[in-house]
């Protein structure tokens, strides 16, 4: 265990500890919880409430669900066009968090036709969280999301449109996967819930963080292809599974292994002993292209690692984590030595945000408590909210269902694999999204069949819970005009709720717009207060720093600041103080001509 005593009493650590505890949610959470409670009480008193209405709309939906291809397309198009329709009220997101800017750096790099960028001359002023500066200037994350966002930038002028399209494909793939495991009507319902609870509002679609849409798409393809392959062994299902495995490898390979390992075991058993398996020659012919795709993807990832990090066997994350972090990713790993931080904001992020949690997990009570809390927020709350919690009361019945036995047996492996990680955020579970939906919908089927004293209370409750999800989505569209928007980090817990973030990042975007409208090239030197929240980072740049209209740099000591200003002597130099009550641009203060600029750090 590593001591954090010098930092444990900082204001930042105090706020981080408060924000990570279970606390009352904002108005949207309270409204949904209230409606869920009312619905439960109503069905106990009037178990047939709304039956005439629901009985009229369910048959045509069931007929649609039986047309499986059309259902999948409808789910994907609904996710796409509904999100576009609400753009006037729910705008294209601005980058806000450290992860956002890191993924956008990858997208910009790929859009420039490069796999990495050379280390800039003044790199110590540009150091930031979740990026590497040496051996190259690059995002620390796996390249999959960056490649997709680069396509969005090149094709549509904005990387978010690629996120939107990928999110729509994710919702469609979830519906397609569910069709292989559940009756068609329930698969369509699952796809609709994916649109309402993930595709429209969650941070998966409305930030640039995580690439969840890509790993969830990959997981859905793998889990959806498995039963189809074992039934028909068609070439297309093998290719879809291979595409899913590649997507997992380019986004979240650790979780991808947790998902793919039991799939490989079951598939291998079928290949050896399955009664309906095709002849070996046919299998080899049909497996050649999928296997070649996977091998090519692994080779390309090795080449990318070589270009970006200097070694084909050095995976993304490794350089940045070894350079800046103390806490490792898994409980069995020892803590890293204390780095020599050049910037106090980065020191506080890696110590107050990460190391305290690492130390807590190294006691038995701490491990149990933190693990339960992580899964409560990242799995239960994110995927169920409050409206979808009641079906989980009958979740134990799912454990005995033959239909989903494979997914039930996978669940302990997935949970154990995630529990040994130091951190757990909902997008870490993205590869398992389709599986989680299948298990949750099966619990909902059991609730629908619940008939206390012969009355259809369960049927009515399921209908009302789905109605609540639809109503809450409508309310979320108008959340900003109604002043129901979720609070910003670190006060809010919007990352763990379906309603997602509000309109964050406006201050930095406003300052950057001002700078871009000025004639000539600009250099913005950022001075933080001692109590700055490191997650609200402003110092991020494009792939080509020296060629950018606006450069963001950290203020350091006076001599380093002077070197920076002299290097960019053709640029107008500005001071930006993000923590001041009124954020505005001001000329960077110089002591006198030819002297070192004054530094807030030396006052």
Language model regions located:
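Membrane-interface alpha helices of multi-pass inner-membrane proteins
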Residues: 150-151, 177, 190-195, 225, ...
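Transmembrane-helix signature of polytopic, membrane-embedded enzymes
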Residues: 174-198, 216-217, 230-240, 401-409
């Amino acid at each position: 265990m590593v001591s954090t005593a010098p930092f444990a009493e900082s204001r930042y650590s105090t706020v981080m500890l408060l924000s990570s505890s279970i606390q009352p949610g904002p108005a949207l959470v309270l409204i949904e919880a209230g409606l869920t409670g009312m619905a439960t009480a109503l069905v106990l008193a009037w178990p047939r409430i709304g039956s005439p209405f629901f009985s009229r709309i369910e048959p045509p939906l069931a007929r649609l669900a039986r047309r499986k291809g059309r259902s999948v397309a409808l789910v994907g198009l609904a996710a796409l066009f509904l999100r576009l329709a609400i753009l006037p009220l729910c705008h294209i997101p601005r980058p806000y968090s450290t992860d956002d800017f890191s993924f956008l750096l990858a997208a910009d790099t790929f859009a420039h036709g490069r796999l990495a960028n050379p280390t800039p001359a003044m790199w110590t002023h540009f150091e930031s969280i979740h990026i590497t500066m040496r051996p190259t200037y690059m995002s620390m994350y796996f390249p999959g999301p960056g490649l997709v966002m680069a396509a969005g930038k090149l094709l549509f002028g904005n990387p978010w449109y690629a996120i939107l399209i990928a999110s729509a494909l994710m919702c469609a793939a979830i519906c397609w996967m569910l069709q292989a495991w559940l009756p068609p009507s329930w698969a369509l319902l699952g796809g609709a819930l994916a649109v309402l609870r993930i595709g429209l509002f969650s941070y998966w679609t409305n930030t640039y963080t995580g690439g969840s849409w890509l790993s969830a798409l990959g997981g859905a393809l793998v889990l959806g292809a498995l039963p189809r392959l074992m039934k028909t062994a068609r070439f297309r299902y093998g290719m879809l599974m291979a595409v899913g495995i590649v997507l997992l490898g380019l986004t979240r390979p650790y979780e991808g292994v947790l998902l793919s390992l039991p799939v490989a075991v079951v598939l291998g058993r079928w290949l050896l002993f399955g009664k309906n398996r095709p002849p070996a020659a046919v299998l080899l012919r049909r497996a050649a292209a999928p296997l070649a795709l996977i091998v090519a993807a692994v080779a390309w990832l090795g080449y990318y690692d070589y270009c970006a990090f200097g070694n084909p066997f050095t995976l993304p994350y490794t350089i940045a984590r070894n350079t800046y972090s103390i806490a490792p990713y898994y409980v069995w790993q020892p803590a890293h030595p204390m780095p020599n931080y050049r910037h106090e904001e980065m020191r506080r992020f890696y110590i107050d945000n990460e190391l305290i949690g690492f130390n807590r997990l190294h006691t038995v009570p701490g491990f149990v408590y933190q693990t339960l809390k992580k899964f409560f927020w990242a799995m239960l709350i994110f995927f169920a909210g409050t409206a979808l919690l009641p079906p989980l009361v009958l979740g134990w019945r799912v454990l005995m269902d033959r239909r989903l036995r494979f997914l039930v047996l996978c669940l302990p492996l997935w949970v154990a694999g995630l529990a040994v990680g130091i951190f757990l955020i909902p997008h870490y579970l993205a590869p398992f999204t389709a599986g989680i939906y299948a298990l949750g919908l099966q619990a909902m089927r059991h609730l629908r069949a619940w008939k206390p004293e012969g009355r259809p209370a369960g049927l009515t409750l399921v209908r009302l819970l789905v109605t609540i999800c639809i109503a809450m989505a409508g309310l979320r569209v108008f959340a900003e005009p109604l002043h129901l928007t979720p609070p910003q980090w670190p006060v809010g817990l919007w990352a763990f709720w379906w309603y997602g973030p509000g309109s964050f990042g406006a201050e930095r975007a406003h300052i950057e717009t001002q700078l871009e409208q000025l004639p000539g090239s600009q250099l913005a030197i950022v001075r933080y207060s001692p109590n700055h929240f490191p997650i609200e980072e402003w110092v991020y740049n494009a792939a080509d720093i020296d060629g950018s209209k606006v450069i963001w740099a950290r203020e350091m000591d006076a001599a380093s600041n002077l070197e920076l200003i002299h290097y960019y002597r053709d640029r107008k130099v500005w001071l930006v103080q993000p923590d001041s009550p009124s954020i505005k641009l001001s000329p960077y203060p110089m002591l006198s001509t030819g002297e070192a600029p004054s530094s807030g750090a030396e006052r």
